[in-house]
Regions:
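Conserved active-site and cofactor/substrate-binding residues in soluble primary-metabolism enzymes
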Residues: 4-7, 38-42, 53, 57, ...
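Oxyanion-binding "anion nests"
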Residues: 48-74
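Adenine-nucleotide phosphate-binding core of ATP-dependent small-molecule kinases
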Residues: 60, 67-70, 78-113
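Hydrophobic alpha-helical scaffolding
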Residues: 33-37, 48, 71, 96, ...
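Glycine-rich phosphate-binding loop of actin/hexokinase-like ATP-binding domains
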Residues: 1-49
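Glycine-rich beta-strand-to-loop/alpha-helix junction loops that act as flexible
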Residues: 3-5, 121-129
Length: 176
């Protein structure tokens, strides 16, 4: 899981990438800092008509004015979003919930398609530094053998570290 201001999930089988959350462009997939991620194709023509956009205007909207920044109505920086959540901002809480849900959804989908998961690698700005996102995404994944060590996860700073419990069937690792 490479998550930061941009982000993608890749399914890797024996060292070969067999699927990725990004499509022809990086817009498909996860909710990102300024990119919308997966969106109903019918919504695009609706937005174009409603907002009077041409193709370039729509591209600008979904690449530069959507995602976390568009939903929260401000910054795309996850540190700002987490600070707003800690301050009790309900909209920021909803945005962070959506952000985390989309990551979990892709991990679960790829694990199902591949018949399981052996290792989950976290990288990118959020993957490396936001212990709360790692915790929330890995919570309730015990059914597939994934158990996060809460203390290791929260104590991890700037170094490669395994953050799964010793009895976890899935190795969870952070790689800066």
């Amino acid at each position: 899981a490479h998550v930061g201001n941009g982000g993608s999930i890749a399914a890797v089988d024996h060292g070969k990438c067999v699927d990725t959350s990004m499509g022809l462009t990086p817009v498909e997939g996860l909710l990102m800092g300024t990119r919308c991620g997966d969106v109903d194709a019918g919504a695009l023509s609706f937005i174009m008509e409603k907002e009077g956009l041409d193709g370039h205007g729509l591209s600008d909207l979904i690449n530069k004015k959507s995602g976390v920044a568009g939903l929260v109505g401000g910054s795309s920086d996850m540190r700002d979003l987490e600070a707003a959540v800690e301050a009790g901002d309900e909209r920021a809480t909803m945005v962070l919930d959506v952000y985390n849900y989309r990551i979990k959804k892709y991990i679960g989908a790829y694990a199902a398609a591949m018949g399981g998961c052996d290792i989950l690698v976290w990288t990118g700005g959020v993957g490396e530094n936001q212990w709360a996102t790692r915790r929330v995404v890995c919570e309730n994944m015990e059914y597939m053998g994934m158990k996060i060590d809460v203390e290791k996860n929260e104590g991890m700073r700037g170094e490669e570290m395994v953050i799964s419990t010793p009895d976890s069937k899935v190795t969870i690792i952070v790689v800066p």
